[in-house]
Regions:
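Sec-dependent N-terminal signal peptides
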Residues: 1-10
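Cap/lid segment of the alpha/beta-hydrolase catalytic domain
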Residues: 111-195, 219, 239-240, 244
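Primarily recognizes the serine-hydrolase "nucleophile elbow" in alpha/beta-hydrolase
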Residues: 148, 185-257
Length: 347
């Protein structure tokens, strides 16, 4: 089965990775030095499989930049709220590119505290929604986390909010990898803050922010806890395998230009991404009636990845909730998620 997939990709003009896993839900297997698929029996075995997954993601998304620039954080506005200070800032992610963001800092900080990267959904106001300045109240999670004592950073995704960005002129292979890089730089910003506990940094996001939370956590292991809401299903379950929605400039154009919208050609899938996060904590909100991300596919992804969390003896593990609602992050599930975060960050 493996060889035909490689041949098909070669005929499409792709440059496939050497190791192609035919079954993306079978995570506890790995190619050995001889090129044979063998069981994953140890953390070392999994580290090899994980590296193959990240390479496959790069094949679709493109590479990350190899050089960082100084963050050069600039504060544009500062507003004193009842329990925190809201700063409108920008930070540099690349030469000539600055990311607008809101930084929420609780008033009464003693010592070092946890910090959360808060990623917005598809909305014109971008970062303003998680910061509590508009949009849907159920998605004001940066505001709510700041009230709970977290430092919260909510950046704009390229082309949303105040972030003007021309994907056509971008040097990146995908909007997705540009977003990942911006979010890695956001973690750099949090790590540079004296009041942030660098061992207690997490990420939370809904929809667009839900899958971007997974993507950045896959590539940045400084992120110790992930909360993803309405962010994924397996590619074959996404609109019955019609993955065109993933192919815009904001996402991964190669899914169309190289892989011709054929899910069987795509070298990675979401069960594998979930696995890359282990042994760190992962909290999933996947509503039963989410028309964007079909819940059966979510459950299949979760079932496939659980073995990795067990293999690595994850202290926090992976928890998934399936509320009876549509594409939403309900009050009760957010409360459970926040309680879960508090436990994940316990010493």
């Amino acid at each position: 089965m493996l060889i035909p997939i490689l041949l098909c990709l070669a005929s499409l003009g792709a440059e496939p990775v050497k190791l192609r896993y035919p079954e993306k839900h079978s995570l506890l297997v790995v190619f050995d030095a001889k090129g044979d698929i063998v069981p994953v029996r140890s953390a070392q075995d999994w580290a090899m499989r994980r590296s193959h997954i990240l390479n496959s993601m790069h094949e679709v998304m493109g590479p990350l930049p190899t050089k960082k620039v100084p963050l050069d954080v600039k504060v544009l506005e500062e507003t004193a709220k009842e329990k925190y200070t809201l700063k409108k800032i920008t930070y540099a992610s690349e030469e000539g590119d600055r990311v607008p963001a809101y930084l929420l800092i609780p008033h009464k900080i003693v010592g070092k505290v946890p910090a959360m990267l808060c990623l917005h959904q598809t909305t014109s106001i971008g970062k303003g929604e998680p910061a509590g300045l508009g949009g849907l109240p159920n998605l004001h999670y940066a505001h709510e986390l700041a009230l709970r004592g977290y430092i919260a950073l909510a950046p704009d995704y390229p082309s949303f909010g105040d972030y003007q960005y021309d994907f056509k002129k971008s040097k990146h292979a995908s909007g997705t990898i540009k977003g990942v890089w911006n979010h890695i730089c956001a973690v750099d910003l949090l790590c540079a803050m004296e009041s942030v506990d660098k061992e207690k940094i997490g990420v939370i996001g809904h929809s667009l922010g839900g899958h971007n939370s997974l993507f950045v956590a896959a590539f940045d292991e400084r992120i110790k806890a992930v909360v993803t809401s309405c962010g994924f299903t397996s590619f074959p379950r996404y609109y019955n395998g019609n993955i065109k929605g993933w192919t815009s400039d904001r996402y991964m154009p190669r899914l169309a230009t190289v892989y011709k919208l054929k899910t069987e050609y795509v070298p990675f899938d979401f069960p594998e991404i979930l696995g890359t996060i282990a042994p760190r904590g992962l909290f999933i909100n996947a509503p039963m009636e989410d028309s964007n991300f079909e819940v059966v596919g979510v459950k299949e992804c979760v079932a496939a990845a659980q073995g990795v969390f067990r293999l690595l003896n994850s202290r926090t593990g992976m928890q998934a909730y399936y509320p009876e609602c549509k594409h939403d992050f309900p009050n009760e599930i957010r409360r459970i998620a926040y309680d879960w975060l508090a436990k994940a960050f316990e010493n």
